[in-house]
Amino acid sequence: MHVIRETLKGGKGEVIKNPKVFIDPLSVFKEIPFREDILRDAAIAIRYFVKNEVKFSNLFLGLTGTGKTFVSKYIFNEIEEVKKEDEEYKDVKQAYVNCREVGGTPQAVLSSLAGKLTGFSVPKHGINLGEYIDKIKNGTRNIRAIIYLDEVDTLVKRRGGDIVLYQLLRSDANISVIMISNDINVRDYMEPRVLSSLGPSVIFKPYDAEQLKFILSKYAEYGLIKGTYDDEILSYIAAISAKEHGDARKAVNLLFRAAQLASGGGIIRKEHVDKAIVDYEQERLIEAVKALPFHYKLALRSLIESEDVMSAHKMYTDLCNKFKQKPLSYRRFSDIISELDMFGIVKIRIINRGRAGGVKKYALVEDKEKVLRALNETFEDSISIGDFDDVGEN
């Protein structure tokens, strides 16, 4: 009982000084290290757009945790501040959309953009793509709009996604676009007419161990109590994260989790970091599953029962019927499986059995137990474990 009281009060042995540093770093950090050149070039392009009506389109490319989203949101916030100081920026309107989080379809992305730019709710269904574009044009008339499309690869890999980009980039409205993608090959999915409208790609190189250590030292300085960590701990976390393509997001998450585990003990030790690594990998998979759109979850649940994609589609169709959802075609279902493979949740295998057996597509779910638990937690209000077990038995 007394332990709970001490924890609630944050007394003896506390490690974390300001958790907001880890949860909302943009509210604390006024500079972004190792990305100064990218920020300067982006600022110049934005200034030309606002003051000289020279439109731009940038594609931010880099692996997870290399600062693409952080830089984009930092730019967004800085523009909002400049609007208070410079009259020429007064009519600049911005819209940030994570394509995957809104569903990834052209309709969902355009609906979200139109809503943010017009200030009105725009339906995701029942409107053709041209009408969405018209709403966006009307919402940006006599102003300058900067659109941020995060995880844009989710959009361009969908049917019609290229049309959205082409319409936005070639629109006669005053719109400039910053696109963000973890998939460094995303341009391969774009049609030539879209590529011809794109500006140069901006590559975010992975952070090395020394850069990660510097970043961690800043988070520790602002977020942790002095004396609760040492240089060796920061170096250890930086070295681990540098091995995984220089992922700063992972490094910061590990430091925060290790600090939470050390709470009450007064100092972060190596065993706290090792435990944080295990927790991080589990949470990353679970959160990825929970963030999936509804039909992706049904597809994933079907794959747990059958690795054969054709058979899994039949089970998926049964699930859709059971829960009064219109099933997607096998082609679209197969596309979803490919996206799940891209997310690292499943691994696809193509087996050619010769002329007699043909080609069969299989998808192995990574860590079935954790994925199943995440699905059950997600569906606990609408779909029980028993509901899944009944599918296919009729």
From Swiss-Prot:
Strain 2-2-12 is a substrain of P2 that is highly susceptible to infection by Sulfolobus turreted icosahedral virus 1 (STIV-1). GO terms for biological process: DNA replication. One of its GO terms (molecular function) is DNA binding. ATP binds at residues 66-70, 207. InterPro entries: AAA_22, Cdc6_C, Cdc6_lid, ORC1/CDC6, Orc1/Cdc6_arc, P-loop_NTPase, WH-like_DNA-bd_sf, WH_DNA-bd_sf. Monomer. Interacts with Cdc6-1, Cdc6-2, MCM and PolB1. This is ORC1-type DNA replication protein 3. Belongs to the CDC6/cdc18 family. The keyword Nucleotide-binding applies. Keywords: ATP-binding, DNA replication, DNA-binding, Nucleotide-binding. Involved in regulation of DNA replication. May play essential roles in origin recognition and cell cycle control of replication. Binds to DNA, with a preference for molecules that contain a bubble, a fork, or a tail. Inhibits the binding of the MCM helicase to the origin DNA and inhibits its DNA helicase activity. Also regulates the DNA polymerase and the nuclease activities of PolB1. Inhibits the DNA-binding activity of Cdc6-1 and Cdc6-2. Induction: (Microbial infection) At least 4-fold induced following infection by Sulfolobus turreted icosahedral virus 1 (STIV-1) in strain 2-2-12. PANTHER family: CELL DIVISION CONTROL PROTEIN 6 HOMOLOG (PTHR10763:SF26), CELL DIVISION CONTROL PROTEIN 6-RELATED (PTHR10763). It comes from the Archaea.
